[in-house]
């Protein structure tokens, strides 16, 4: 009799250029990262596989290491999935690493796991075509120290309802931001935010508000006012996706 393979859960770390995709999550009217991964896995294993991602990134957003899992009975060694999938994926999606995790391991519901996002701003007099895909262009001078002063109000546990899209489909809008660092090197400003989780559009709205602080439209204290208002707001004009 044929030996039945054991179901295993495989974890993958996925990097991608999101420019040509309608985000992570499968959409009826656009190509997504999840769809490409599912199709590659189905071709590889001959199983009907659906990946579960840690971060459902928006259209145009990039990733260096989005974590996802899938269940399979395939005998392929866990560490070989990365190589095998990369042969079947477009060049703008790469599985950096693969390993096996317990069957109850879920990328979104693990204790003591943090997520880090970076938002890149290219701040110069004229755009740089080599930066356009991965940075948001701002031609006006930016006060980085003012941005840092405003960012301090966002660190800690807060109700971030003012910093999420009105389409956010959760009742619990409390999140903890562990760190929000703003670095400037040459013509590039990088906002690096680490937290226990993020609401829909939260990082892009944080970036949008801090860009306004940097340009002098808002005082740093305005960040606290927006946070304390606890209402969905468009004041932070969501920053474009390509910088994330």
Regions found by a protein language model. Give the residues of each.
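Structured-RNA-binding interfaces characteristic of tRNA pseudouridine synthases
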Residues: 2-244
